[in-house]
Amino acid sequence: MSAAEIDEGVFETTATIDNGSFGTRTIRFETGRLALQAAGAVVAYLDDDNMLLSATTASKNPKEHFDFFPLTVDVEERMYAAGRIPGSFFRREGRPSTDAILTCRLIDRPLRPSFVDGLRNEIQIVVTILSLDPGDLYDVLAINAASASTQLGGLPFSGPIGGVRVALIDGTWVGFPTVDQIERAVFDMVVAGRIVEGDVAIMMVEAEATENVVELVEGGAQAPTESVVAAGLEAAKPFIAALCTAQQELADAAGKSGKPTVDFPVFPDYGEDVYYSVSSVATDELAAALTIGGKAERDQRIDEIKTQVVQRLADTYEGREKEVGAALRALTKKLVRQRILTDHFRIDGRGITDIRALSAEVAVVPRAHGSALFERGETQILGVTTLDMIKMAQQIDSLGPETSKRYMHHYNFPPFSTGETGRVGSPKRREIGHGALAERALVPVLPSVEEFPYAIRQVSEALGSNGSTSMGSVCASTLALLNAGVPLKAPVAGIAMGLVSDDIQVEGAVDGVVERRFVTLTDILGAEDAFGDMDFKVAGTKDFVTALQLDTKLDGIPSQVLAGALEQAKDARLTILEVMAEAIDRPDEMSPYAPRVTTIKVPVDKIGEVIGPKGKVINAITEETGAQISIEDDGTVFVGATDGPSAQAAIDKINAIANPQLPTVGERFLGTVVKTTDFGAFVSLLPGRDGLVHISKLGKGKRIAKVEDVVNVGDKLRVEIADIDKRGKISLILVADEDSTAAATDAATVTS
């Protein structure tokens, strides 16, 4: 539908997502009511309960000294959106959650390349979550809201950009699925793009298989193979087109109301005269340098050439040294791409489908529960696995549906990994994003908590970087998890693909007709990532894709090219999996330093007895046995210890309380005196089960004046149950020495 003016100066448009038997979703955009002082502001609604405000602003003056585009995207989660008060000490929102940071990246990735090159004004997009249905996700709605507000801001922006989540449920791709629907899906994909010449150009993809994919596929669901994923990208296009159309109609209506379009100055990285001079003096030497295989040696030689070129052109372009450096980078990009497109050879001499030398090794960190070192060329990743009790799962306080996370994947990228200096400390957005990608790749193959009752922390240390440390992290993590004894459903490997393209003259054409030429690269280097047209990361098992991430600088990639890239990635993935299998092909025995966690069930009405007043009972069991104990609300008890006897002792004590075997007359025990009184001694038979030896029974037929003359607290006595009264009180007698050896048993073991 076209835009409607619902109030003076207030316009709205809607886009309807028709999912057939899965229902429809309505996305509504409104402008002119809120945040009127922003350059562009849009309120986006998903059905009735989900409401976001996106505001885009631009600085008045450009930052001419910047050599990059200063775009900032912030997502503000407001807890009132879900009717909650923040759980922090000050009861207000603090640093952004992981969900918010990942949404910022989802917005930034398709929007950043859509701004004109050379823009140096600071642009800020702030998305505020105002209302959220717990059954929905807000990230994709935020992409559309951010695009719409930017489109309204009068900025040099080639939008609008539409974003949609599609999930494969019962063989159908469903747009804007609910959280419940995603749980029934085998694959979940966020796709963003814009309309170019009547078709949708895909600019960004973030996708993963769901947690239940293996079980669903075994039950007959369609596996997310490469061809299925490619079909999902095509299925997303009509939804994206509808969203882009609605945004454009809103911008057209708001523009007619008199909002001026602003002209922003553009600062090219270099002038044509500078590029001509640099190419004339540096082409031959630079082309030779780009044949050096080693990254460090190649970079050193290019730096030497740059210094020589800057010195040589210093007088001609005084004060324009930055332009000379930028022109040299542009020339480098041109030469790299020419060699790939024309000769099908790459910087390091590989062919377009060749993978760098691979190496895999496990058990490299002595006391770690699991560890591995994975190397692909100069990319080197150390993976380390730590296992702990389920109670160590991460607790999440955000607007997302997830409240705890049992598997945590943390990615670190220290500056020395690229031979540089820099800040170390808290993770940056890039590190959080890479860790999340590796996590999504592995979650589908993790065992359930019933099969493996542990919290798992996986850390990926990027010790060397020259192309796709995130996919290297997937490989290293698979190896480390297997080394830790985690029974993965299947090993997972990942590979980064690239794409280089240009326009060539069609042979025999007389009117200058050109066609697009594409070359897909396997296992891209860092330079190929920077100079190429696509960064395409694919992770999966030998049978299906578990995670996928795509960013492209082109106005769309033909579906057949994308399908070919997926198949090329599968070939590489299978090769890597073979190398990994040589290092480890099944779960190892668990490390002696890892806790042994056992699961038992107790009746819900017995939980209080196991815990005891103020935790007295459970703390006593922990202290006596050295085991860690965690109790869930449903009566599931996790008992963990680094040695089996400690765990078993704790289990026996818990069972004695929660699942007691009532003693009977005639049973014998080796008990501990826990209390003495004037009339006798109380002996502990089982946890929570004591009996009394009357003073008259302590003297073995002789009269004694004081209990302490015979026994004291802590003494061991061999006793027999003589009587149990109606109230359950147990009377004991001492077992004669001649009978004790054959008859008495340990207090933890009852003999009938």
From Swiss-Prot:
Catalytic activity: RNA(n+1) + phosphate = RNA(n) + a ribonucleoside 5'-diphosphate
Gene3D superfamilies with a match to the protein in the record: GHMP Kinase, N-terminal domain, K Homology domain, type 1, Nucleic acid-binding proteins
GO annotation, biological process: mRNA catabolic process; RNA catabolic process; RNA processing
CC per GO annotation: cytosol; peptidoglycan-based cell wall; plasma membrane
Annotated keywords: Cytoplasm, Magnesium, Metal-binding, Nucleotidyltransferase, RNA-binding, Transferase
Location in the cell: Cytoplasm
SMART domains (alphabetical): KH, S1
Enzyme class: transferase
Residues binding Mg(2+): D529, D535
Essential cofactor(s): Mg(2+)
Molecular function via GO: 3'-5'-RNA exonuclease activity; magnesium ion binding; polyribonucleotide nucleotidyltransferase activity; RNA binding
E.C. code: 2.7.7.8
Residues in KH domain copies: 595-654
S1 motif domain ranges (all copies): 666-735
Stated family: Belongs to the polyribonucleotide nucleotidyltransferase family.
Function: Involved in mRNA degradation. Catalyzes the phosphorolysis of single-stranded polyribonucleotides processively in the 3'- to 5'-direction.
Protein name: Polyribonucleotide nucleotidyltransferase
Gene: pnp
